[in-house]
A protein has these predicted regions:
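Conserved beta-strand-loop surface patch within small alpha/beta domains used
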Residues: 1-74, 82-133
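Conserved, mostly hydrophobic/aromatic
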Residues: 77
Length: 133
């Protein structure tokens, strides 16, 4: 995957989720088809930490079941960082076992970036797909 596709409204929603959970990291699953995000599923950070996040296993199972029931996939994991929007050493470990796009939002820089892991971390583009009418 070379890009992940989000609407402006989805980007704003993710930024709002990140800001609403300050000072802690926020997290969400992005459900969709191929590279296009169709649904944002906010998750609770059970770590309640400004530097890490974890999701309750039952909530993870619910997200995967919901995606399957709607004909979608979990295409990305979103979370916020208090600093730069780049993967931490902890993120890198989890990216290896969760081979989806990782979208990171910096609450200090109001900047969002997306990454994939395939033997190494690679930044990918975020494509805005607003429909003009």
């Amino acid at each position: 995957m070379k890009t992940i596709s989000l609407t402006t409204a989805q980007i704003k929603k993710l930024a709002r989720i990140a800001k609403d959970t300050l000072p802690n990291e926020s997290c969400a699953f992005l459900l969709g088809d191929n590279d296009k995000v169709l649904k944002i599923l906010p998750m609770r950070n059970i770590d309640e930490s400004p530097v890490t996040f974890s999701i309750e296993p039952a909530e993870l199972l619910h997200a995967y079941n919901l995606a399957e029931s709607k004909g979608m996939q979990v295409i990305a994991i979103f979370h916020s960082h208090p600093a730069k929007p780049r993967p931490s050493s902890t993120d890198l470990k989890f990216m290896e076992i969760n081979p989806v796009v990782w979208v990171i939002y910096s609450t200090t820089e109001s900047q969002m970036k997306a990454y994939v892991y395939d033997d190494f971390v690679k930044e990918i583009g975020i494509r805005i797909v607003d429909v003009r009418g």
